[in-house]
Regions:
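Long, low-complexity or tandemly repetitive, helically biased scaffold regions used
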Residues: 2-173
């Protein structure tokens, strides 16, 4: 659903912000492709860096969406489609990184200290990504590969839950 605002933005401002969003997604793509996920202090920090950067992208996407949805002169389908494509690309990247990291966790015989926090964060992240991708505006930009990655991520989460069901204990301690 479009975010309606009394403020109208010049197209050049929306485009400038969209370019910044696309650049951040490109930078995060490079960062993620250079990251080798293993479990240990340094790798966890590296993944935390990825998560922080993806959070910044999400925040910027809110700002960009407000501008794209409230242009002076009315809607611009090309700009809106470009924004929607960027959102899908960001979600694809986040799901891919989550998959890589969860795969590492699922292969461990014993989960590391703090695994509950990591796991619950990944579960939230996967859920949020899936919910964002359910926006009908994004459907034209979602391919079968992304749908498959979401299914794989859910399977990996199931493996982790089966390996350590205590991670999902929600009773008061």
């Amino acid at each position: 659903m479009a975010v309606k605002s009394k403020i109208k933005y010049p197209q050049r401002e929306a485009l400038r912000m969209l370019l910044a969003l696309e650049q951040q997604i490109d930078d995060l793509t490079a960062f993620e492709s250079e990251t080798e996920y293993t479990v240990g202090a340094l790798s966890t920090d590296r993944y935390a860096q990825f998560r922080a950067k993806s959070g910044e992208i999400y925040t910027l996407s809110i700002v960009v969406k407000t501008r794209v949805d409230n242009l002076q002169g009315g809607p611009d389908k090309e700009l809106a489609d470009r924004f929607d494509r960027s959102v899908v690309n960001a979600q694809r990247l986040i799901i891919q990184a989550s998959l890589r990291f969860m795969d590492v966790l699922s292969k461990l015989d014993v989960l590391p200290l703090g695994a509950r926090e990591i796991f619950t964060g990944e579960l939230r992240s996967l859920y949020d990504a899936r919910e964002r991708l359910r926006d009908p505006r994004l459907a034209p930009f979602i391919d079968d590969g992304l749908e498959k990655k979401i299914g794989v991520a859910e399977a990996v989460l199931t493996t982790i839950i089966e390996k350590a069901p205590q991670l999902m204990s929600f009773t008061a301690a």
